């Protein structure tokens, strides 16, 4: 049912917040109830969720993962854009170049995720056409150190050329 999506989206819209629909997580307990990664194989249901959230006036993000057999992320990005999504948040796994394909396929705001740790990873993703990057779990390093490096790299990327 889309009712919980509508309710959450209405709250997000009222608070100028983003609702992110999880078509990403692969934990068995989420997949068993039809959430997370299972939505990638059920684009009709995912589309209904996006349409319901967008109808409430919320900014809608869809988090997806690369390397799921049978899933064409650029085509899915186009579908999500038509359904009313504003953002696609891509866990690029071991296929960073998928960011380029997704960015070229739609006008969605693209957030790249996976192994964002430093200047090189930020520049790689932004170079592929991502509009932003997100940091998941900083492996063994303290979160603050990773975040400072990523923030500096983004600032450097966005600095005006003199």
What are these regions (language model features)?
Residues 1-74, 96:
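Active-site entrance/lid segments in N-terminal catalytic domains of soluble metabolic enzymes
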Residues 3-15, 68-80, 104-112, 116-135:
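Catalytic cores of alpha/beta
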Residues 15-28, 85-95, 128-150:
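Glycine-rich phosphate-binding active-site loops on the catalytic face of alpha/beta enzymes
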Residues 31-34, 101-105, 137-162:
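C-terminal helical cap(s) of enzyme catalytic domains, especially alpha/beta-barrels
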Residues 36-38, 79, 152:
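Residue-level signature of transmembrane alpha-helix interfaces in integral membrane proteins
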Residues 38, 42, 65, 88-92, ...:
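Glycine- and other small-residue-rich loops at beta-strand/loop junctions that grip anionic moieties
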Residues 45-56, 71-84, 93-107, 116-119:
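Short loop-to-alpha-helix "cap/lid" segments that border enzyme active sites
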Residues 48-52, 111-122, 139-144, 158-162:
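Short, basic, helix/turn surface patches
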